């Protein structure tokens, strides 16, 4: 049996109940227009539906929400390996006012289970990326590198106003990253454009420092998307769009030796890739025990390359 779950001029999504359903990656692709869910098409009539019964089909979902308004598109997300429903889906109303009707109804039950509809793209103000700054994040320093080594190297590019390394209070050893502040943002631009620099025989990564209010939502969504990837069988760019609705996962998804560390960044800054910068990374010396090794097969995610200090465990040593 073939059930058509879309109407109107938009693309039609079709699920087959007696044969393997549409691959989860393809279903997800129809719902993801950007890599982080904050740009691209944000249909005001679109809703995320969580808490679905494993037996709920796209047709059942469409029939239920059809009482609130004409449904333009509807889908239930499935695991591409097992073909089982993953307990959540999406609907898009023709008239965005139908979303308010759904939200005004406090309780929703479908197939004997309470479900949780939410606005797929909630309105929120996001801090803008800082592109002009004199402060640069330096990551991947060798254990033998000193504050003086870092300062001397970057002084070859311009005057250094401030330099600091972040130290572990318990071991009194630096954690492999720090910050350099130049006397002009032009020098910082040049350093970040080169991106990788060699200090004491080890490649280090330079990124423009960003206010933590910029990095916090990015990091949270990236971390949750990375954790959920295997469970939901979706590519990261899709999960990022809906990461705020997915279950929270335990464990530390950032760099080794770092925990919840958004609270005490010096000056409220962290590192973030420069927009439009090259993503080509040269052969480097980041092994699995290094600062840049992640627990997801060694894949380096740009936003997870940001360093934050734990309020109780880390402090800085400054040259000035």
Swiss-Prot record:
Gene3D superfamilies: 3.30.70.330. One of its GO terms (cellular component) is perikaryon. Expressed in the gut and in AVA, AFD, RMD, RMED, RMEV, RMER and RMEL neurons (at protein level). In the tail expressed in neurons and all the ray sensilla. Expressed in male specific C1-C4 neurons. Changing residue 34 to A: Increases short and long term memory retention in response to repeated exposure to diacetyl, a chemical repellent. It is found in: Cytoplasm; Perikaryon. Keywords: Cytoplasm, Phosphoprotein, Repeat, RNA-binding. Residues 1-48 are annotated as: Disordered. Residues 45-124, 134-211 form the RRM domain. The modification Phosphothreonine is found at residue 18. Residues 1-14 have a biased composition (Low complexity). The modification Phosphoserine is found at residues 19, 34. GO terms for biological process: nervous system process; regulation of translation. It comes from the Eukaryota. This is RNA-binding protein Musashi homolog 1. It comes from Caenorhabditis elegans.
């Amino acid at each position: 049996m073939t059930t058509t779950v879309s109407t109107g001029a938009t693309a039609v999504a079709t699920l087959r109940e007696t044969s393997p359903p549409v691959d989860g990656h393809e279903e997800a692709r129809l719902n993801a227009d950007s890599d982080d869910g904050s740009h691209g098409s944000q249909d005001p009539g679109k809703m995320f539906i969580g808490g679905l019964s494993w037996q709920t089909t796209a047709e059942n979902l469409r029939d239920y929400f059809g009482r609130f308004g004409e449904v333009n598109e509807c889908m239930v997300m499935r695991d591409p390996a097992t073909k089982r429903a993953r307990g959540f889906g999406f609907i898009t109303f023709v008239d965005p006012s139908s979303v308010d009707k759904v939200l005004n109804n406090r309780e929703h039950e479908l197939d004997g289970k309470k479900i949780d509809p939410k606005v797929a793209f909630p309105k929120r103000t996001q801090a803008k990326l800082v592109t002009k700054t004199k402060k640069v994040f330096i990551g991947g320093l060798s254990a033998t590198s000193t504050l003086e080594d870092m300062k001397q190297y970057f002084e070859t590019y311009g005057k250094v106003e401030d330099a600091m390394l972040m130290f572990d209070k318990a071991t009194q050893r630096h954690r492999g990253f720090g910050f350099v502040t130049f006397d002009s943002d032009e020098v910082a631009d040049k350093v970040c454009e080169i991106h990788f620099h060699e200090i004491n025989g080890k490649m280090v990564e330079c990124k423009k420092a960003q206010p933590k209010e910029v990095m916090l939502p990015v990091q949270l969504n990236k971390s949750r998307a990375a954790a959920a990837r295997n469970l939901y069988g979706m590519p990261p760019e899709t999960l990022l769009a809906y990461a705020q609705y997915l279950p929270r996962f335990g464990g530390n998804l950032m760099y080794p030796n770092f925990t919840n560390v958004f609270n005490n960044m010096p000056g409220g800054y962290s590192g973030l890739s420069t927009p439009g910068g090259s993503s080509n990374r040269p052969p480097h010396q980041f092994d699995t025990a290094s600062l840049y090794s992640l627990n997801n097969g060694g894949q380096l995610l740009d936003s997870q390359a940001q360093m934050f200090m734990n309020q109780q465990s880390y402090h800085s040593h400054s040259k000035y």
